[in-house]
A protein has these predicted regions:
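C-terminal helical cap(s) of enzyme catalytic domains, especially alpha/beta-barrels
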Residues: 55-64, 200-214, 256, 268-293
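Alpha/beta enzyme core
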Residues: 104-241, 247-262
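N-terminal capping/small domains of soluble enzymes
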Residues: 1-97, 102-104
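Short glycine-centered, acidic/aromatic-flanked micro-motifs in structured strand/loop junctions
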Residues: 21, 101, 129, 167, ...
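A short, charged, Gly/Pro-tolerant segment at domain boundaries
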Residues: 296-305
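Short secondary-structure boundary segments
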Residues: 45-47, 129, 193-194, 267-268
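Short acidic/polar active-site loop segments enriched in Thr and Asp
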Residues: 39-40, 45, 95, 122-125, ...
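Surface-exposed amphipathic alpha-helices with a cationic face
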Residues: 6-7, 11, 82-93, 117, ...
Length: 305
């Protein structure tokens, strides 16, 4: 009998399948389709201090092998998430959940994380450092090791629960960013976030997205995710959550061999709302097909092959 359980920052997961933030909402809508308790956990939609209405339309564009999005962190704000979204989730999900946090200043990250840290349902805080730093010329925190470390250090000092830093792939060396976050106290890292891209409407002769650029997700970016998980695994000793183009159980196994402790789908949930349930269902057979008895034994296994 195969063993699919893994441990993430001291919390045991039944399996390593973790739907990525942004495409799984706050979970309860998917619970109308299937029992979401089958998942290892999931990361809910990015939360900011204030309500955000998001970017102008159109926000979504098709792309070869995936899609572009520029939703713009639309969410009701942290107080509404705690008062309205988490109680609804508690009725249908009976495991610790990952709270994804976005901010435009270190102070905002700290305030939002501190509030979510006090919520019983929240098991981990996932800090999305792909946001622009309004006090740093607008560059994303995640593009500079010092800025990434500053956010990580400030959040760690303010909370008790494990801090996972979500890394941007739009950098010269993701390993350097990961190492800076680890040195600043991060308990884990998650990667990759979407890859910056653009599509242009040939008839209108202007960008398809109102925001001009957007984040590319879907199967086309999966090899990038594998490469970056590999590089980060060689740079740090903290756990890695792998994501980016995951659509099937074999993809999760591949990310784990590259160094991830867990992995999950993002855009796949928009194509097939049952995608992550199907990955959980198919995982034991995929393990048998590749002679894998215990998932904990294969983490980073390709580095020793």
């Amino acid at each position: 009998m195969v063993r699919a359980a893994v441990s993430l920052c001291g919390i045991e997961l039944d399996n390593p399948v973790i739907p990525a933030s942004g495409t799984f909402g706050h979970g309860y809508t998917f619970a109308e389709l299937y029992d979401i308790d089958c998942l290892g956990t999931f990361s809910f939609k990015g939360t900011t201090r204030e309500q955000r209405l998001g970017n102008a339309q159109p926000r979504i564009a098709e792309a070869p092998g995936g899609m572009l999005n520029a939703v713009g962190l639309q969410n009701p704000g942290v107080d509404a998430v705690i008062a309205e979204e988490l109680p609804r989730l508690k009725q249908v999900f009976h495991k610790p959940v990952m709270a994804n946090v976005s901010g435009f200043s270190i102070e905002e990250y700290v305030e939002v994380c501190r509030k979510l840290d006090a919520c019983e349902q929240v098991g981990w805080l996932e800090v999305n450092i792909s946001c622009p730093n309004v006090h740093g010329g607008g560059l994303a925190f995640g593009t500079d090791p010092k800025a990434a470390a500053s956010v990580t250090r400030a959040v760690k000092a303010a909370v008790k629960k494990p801090v996972i830093v979500k890394l941007s792939p739009n950098v010269t060396s993701i390993a350097d960013i990961a190492r800076a976050c680890e040195d600043a106290g991060a308990d884990a890292v998650s990667l990759i976030n979407t890859v910056l891209g653009m599509r242009i409407d040939l008839r209108a002769k202007r960008p398809l997205l109102a925001n001009k650029t957007g984040g590319m997700s879907g199967p086309a970016i999966f090899p990038l995710a594998v490469r970056m998980v590999w590089q980060v695994y060689e740079a740090v000793r903290i756990p890695i959550i792998g994501m980016g183009g995951v659509t099937r159980a074999e993809d999760v196994l591949e990310l784990m061999l590259a160094g991830a402790t867990a992995g999950g789908g993002g855009a796949a949930n928009l194509v097939n709302p049952y995608a992550c349930r199907d990955i959980v269902r198919d995982l034991p057979q995929a393990m048998q097909n590749y002679n894998i008895q215990n998932l904990k034994d294969i983490i980073g296994g390709a580095h020793h092959g």
